[in-house]
Amino acid sequence: MAGAAAAVAAGAAAGAAAAAVSVAAPGRASAPPPPPPVYCVCRQPYDVNRFMIECDICKDWFHGSCVGVEEHHAVDIDLYHCPNCAVLHGSSLMKKRRNWHRHDYTEIDDGSKPVQAGTRTFIKELRSRVFPSADEIIIKMHGSQLTQRYLEKHGFDVPIMVPKLDDLGLRLPSPTFSVMDVERYVGGDKVIDVIDVARQADSKMTLHNYVKYFMNPNRPKVLNVISLEFSDTKMSELVEVPDIAKKLSWVENYWPDDSVFPKPFVQKYCLMGVQDSYTDFHIDFGGTSVWYHVLWGEKIFYLIKPTDENLARYESWSSSVTQSEVFFGDKVDKCYKCVVKQGHTLFVPTGWIHAVLTSQDCMAFGGNFLHNLNIGMQLRCYEMEKRLKTPDLFKFPFFEAICWFVAKNLLETLKELREDGFQPQTYLVQGVKALHTALKLWMKKELVSEHAFEIPDNVRPGHLIKELSKVIRAIEEENGKPVKSQGIPIVCPVSRSSNEATSPYHSRRKMRKLRDHNVRTPSNLDILELHTREVLKRLEMCPWEEDILSSKLNGKFNKHLQPSSTVPEWRAKDNDLRLLLTNGRIIKDERQPFADQSLYTADSENEEDKRRTKKAKMKIEESSGVEGVEHEESQKPLNGFFTRVKSELRSRSSGYSDISESEDSGPECTALKSIFTTEESESSGDEKKQEITSNFKEESNVMRNFLQKSQKPSRSEIPIKRECPTSTSTEEEAIQGMLSMAGLHYSTCLQRQIQSTDCSGERNSLQDPSSCHGSNHEVRQLYRYDKPVECGYHVKTEDPDLRTSSWIKQFDTSRFHPQDLSRSQKCIRKEGSSEISQRVQSRNYVDSSGSSLQNGKYMQNSNLTSGACQISNGSLSPERPVGETSFSVPLHPTKRPASNPPPISNQATKGKRPKKGMATAKQRLGKILKLNRNGHARFFV
């Protein structure tokens, strides 16, 4: 049979070509391969892209275009005779039609076989059937009403009909636009896919030949064109996609311009069908939604809702060998009929099963698009296509690749929504959960080889899946119950876009492009520029103005540490700068250290994602702290304690030292500490790390405040000539240099956490200026050590001059009971003899500790313990609201704003011999100044 021969033409030619290739034996010179065989009257080699037919007489192969045989005509030829053989044997013999209801019309019509879809008999029966009207389910609306906000709020789960083009954003040619105009814009030589409706089979032909067929009133067959995508042709300039389709489309919003995968073009199709063209029931590839606009003519849609039962029946029907013999509309409860007339536009949602009948010659335009509103259904349809082994030609191009792009961008979107204080929409959370499940499935060991090809280069699959898990878990914990991943929401919460106008983050979010996968890290020049501007401002100010500016700067920069979800709108705009300045010097930088730049990869924005995830986690932890504000009256004893501490500071007493040194005295304090230790052991590891880091930030605030006090000289000490109100002596500059270097070290710990320290700025502005004077000896004692404590370790510290040692622990006053608070006051009031005894015990302990800490180095344990640093300068822990004070343990020796310590006696040097030239503070300071003069400032870095 000539038709069967044409179907196997490719295999026969390929086999002949393979047999003609000779393989050289090892060690012998290979002869040049013979030329490939040639065929047809044109004597050209085999081309897989060109249709060929075999002559049943001479057995030679001919290109259909060379002998005037169309591909869709070849199936009707019984015996084919080539032009040479036709001279002797006559023309080709055609098949005889024996029925009108079967795809193979040569079958004998004995009435025993059912009608198949697409045949003439089937079309007649379909036209005569009665179906429920689609008016029961579809929504008719004006173009201006069809907005993204509407769909996000009400969902996109039923078809939408728009009778007019007004306000749709859809631009099309005039209704006089014909198929000949299509040929003129697209090109007559373009090869297109054509469906032979009676056989429900696909074939190829040129656009010119199809236009010729379309314009012929005597059409031997019913041919339908439904897949002419013209985005890469001149006709694309005549058509603009509806605005709603562009706003929702994954390809338009998430596909990166620099992707190695070619961008899918599925938004602009031209559909040309003659009367009685029929497309059987199907779901559009990849579960895409689709828009149709009838330019002229008419189309009838048969719509079936994608319920779980209907989808299961559809999959079973599609895989059946008798699919064409069963009308799927009879297998479901309801199949709705929707007539789309000239000028009407129909939007079909994800997963809807539909068939299309062209009731009269028609030209229509349409397009497919994936979107966020029904991600779960889209993935379900894609998995169904794979189970049904759908050919790649009928699948969405690079569906899995775009899922990775979308997952990466939706992760960013969810984090931004939670930072801005918006609750993510239900449909979005459901979609991300479905997407996360699909990505995990694709990355399984037994399946990863099938899906690895479509993983983008700039996506780290494992890391992305973990980050999605964290965000989903955090959202579920906030909502108090898991979010269901199945089903389509009928009513969605208010969209994020509806709140953008009132959001302080609107402009920032508007400027951010979702396709931007790179994160720019600020350079050191940016830091220096900001620092220089602040210093120049301060040089022009009086001392009292400087105090005000310092308090404002501290408050401003510390505000950035508060999670953005809890920052009021009037403070949200002051969070740009992250440098902490004191007297014109940088002592703390909250940004990512520059040293980490070498670790950045193509998707380095995940580092920023980690910080945002931690911000989101802290929202839950701070919720318990916010409740503490309501019980502020019950904590008056604790507030009274801090009032007394402030008064002691104003009188230059040793309030903090006394507290530190008398902390462990008395059984009541011991009992109180044990209670807190038990509660600490019950807290999670993440909470401990966050509170530890917040304590280091509080320590930095204490150092900054004390330095500002100590560097303001009394009137008798003001030099006659001053270049700047904040100028200091040479020794003070050296000490401040040490402080600046130490601050940079601490930033590596601080930059990973988010902590609110607003009250520190207020405290600076409220302190009495008369109490801001301190001796240089205090500064030397305060900043003795120059090696920072590693964040997250339980550290034992010893000060050889202060003769004190302390195990730094963490307490959380949000858990205090009134009895504990009164008990803590008793411990704090113990002074005098208890203070002296504590110092003696500390001195003895230092004497017996050996010389392990001779050079000011710390001993660090390798394992994390339940103890965590908590400093009492009034800063807030992650669970403490603004304005709530805290009961704290002894301050770290290098951060404690202690008063003048007792003189160093000879007893201090017993048990260990100090290093030569480093015995006293004066000798050590001289050593530091000498190093500065010799240009060894890098020693401190």
Swiss-Prot record:
Subcellular location: Nucleus
Matches recorded under SUPFAM superfamilies: Clavaminate synthase-like, FYVE/PHD zinc finger
Keywords in alphabetical order: Chromatin regulator, Dioxygenase, Iron, Metal-binding, Neurogenesis, Nucleus, Oxidoreductase, Phosphoprotein, Transcription, Transcription regulation, Zinc, Zinc-finger
Zinc keyword on record: yes
GO molecular function: 2-oxoglutarate-dependent dioxygenase activity; histone demethylase activity; histone H3K27me2/H3K27me3 demethylase activity; histone H3K36 demethylase activity; histone H3K9 demethylase activity; histone H3K9me/H3K9me2 demethylase activity; histone H4K20 demethylase activity; iron ion binding
Annotated binding of substrate, by residue: 279, 299
Protein name, per record: Lysine-specific demethylase 7A
Organism, scientific name: Homo sapiens (Human)
Gene encoding the protein: KDM7A
